[in-house]
Amino acid sequence: MKFLVIKHVVVEGLGVFEQFCHDAGIEIDTVELEKGDIFPNLEGYTALWIMGGPMNVGDEVEFPWLVEEKAFIRKAVRELNLPYMGVCLGAQLLADALGGEVKPMSATEVGLLPITMTSDGLHHPLMTGLPATLNVLQWHGQEVKQIPAGSKLLASSSHCQVQAYAVGDRAFGLQFHSEVTDATVEDWVKISAYHADLEVTLGSTGADDLKQAVSQHLTAMNSEAKIIFDNFLRIVEGRSR
């Protein structure tokens, strides 16, 4: 089994999912767009994961590879029916590429915040085994306003309606960061846009406060990430729980 992972910036990778892949014997190929890597042929890959980044889906002038990336997503999901997991920007790109709508939020959502499963989410194979409400790491200023036609909304929050959704049976978007590790906050505050969002939302001590909160909840968040990962593998392999 081999996963293709698209990274927009060096510090936003698979996180804890990388260890899960290693433990499961899954090979990982990584494309680093920040370093100028090109999109490869999708032949031979079991699944496509697209991670987060500080850019927005509409920033095609500054980041012209976004146009190619959206076409890449359409080919993977629509033409090849390749299992897909998009995290944060990866979730927004999935929506934008497939006819949904992504817009700026009224206020940036940053912090450790609760999301709640929808009725579809409670019974969906990707979310099986998760609690009805869970605390997750949020760090975004744009959101999916409209999921692609025929998609299912799986989770919501009071600040952002679309926290998780499914396109068909094998493509998923997670607005929240279930890949979080103990190094995530420290790494991400090095990105100027993220640091600014953090201070505006949580104040001058926001980085330290968020690191402490993540540390306190990390075991639970990683356990929930493992549930999502295992469920995704079952979907990829066509197994039921």
Regions found by a protein language model. Name each.
Residues 170, 179-214:
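C-terminal helical/coil "lid" or tail adjacent to the Rossmann-like core of SAM-dependent
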Residues 11-12, 93, 160, 180:
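Short alpha-helical
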Residues 20-23, 64-68, 101-103, 154-155, ...:
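Glycine-rich, phosphate-binding/catalytic loops in enzymes
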Residues 2, 83, 133-135:
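Residues that mark the start of a beta-strand
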Residues 50-121:
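Cysteine-nucleophile active-site neighborhood
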Residues 98-183:
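Pocket-forming structural segment of enzyme catalytic cores
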Residues 1-79, 202-241:
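N-terminal beta1-alpha1 cap of cysteine-dependent amidohydrolase-like domains
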Residues 15-16, 59-61, 95-97, 148, ...:
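Short glycine-/acidic-enriched loop or helix-start segments at secondary-structure transitions
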